[in-house]
Amino acid sequence: VYGIPQAMVQVMERAGVDFATLGGDEWCCGYPLFTAGMEGLVAPLMEHNVARLQDMGAKTLVTTCPSCHYTWSHLYPLLGAPPIDIEVLHASQYLVRILESGQLRLGAFEQVVTYHDPCDLGRKSGIFDEPRQVIEGVPGVELREMDGSREEALCCGGGGDVQIVDESVTAAVADRRLGQAQRTGARLVLSACQQCKRTLMAAARRNKVRVRVMDVAELVWRAMEG
């Protein structure tokens, strides 16, 4: 899953985007603690992260993680973060901007794919269209929707810290979602979340299913390199 932010960095560099990363100053956003009921432990992380971003003078924050996006855009204000003049975008939203600007030349990527909506990106943040716009912006890709998509999408099984509590629940839900993906006939399952990728990859290995799982940022990077 480390390949996801690495792919995004490669895409942004190729597009000529002026950006920086926090490196070692990037702390966890605190979302796993919040979902575990440890709200009081989130504040130090929030204060550190907000201060570092202000120090950089950044105007836009781009994250490849839907949980981080939800935390910065929804939870931090609720938890008392000071108002900051920073636009918070998920990577899929920023990729749409890059593709629409014409800053990238993409090669053909002939593949039938299906897309899994992450819970934190879709139902919780309302971001459904942008990942699909990215997918459809890659030449040669045919997108086939699963039975459950958008608001009706099944969880990958790995959200909400559930895997820490009961891995069997995660496995059962992931197996069901993988079955929905298989029925589309796609050989490539796309998502926009590192946890979804990890969980669905594990399900494919467990069930010996010959499908690949990839993030939309990795799709753009592959098409860019191709």
Task: Cite the ranges covered by each PLM segment.
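Iron-sulfur cluster-binding electron-transfer modules in prokaryotic oxidoreductases
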Residues: 1-226
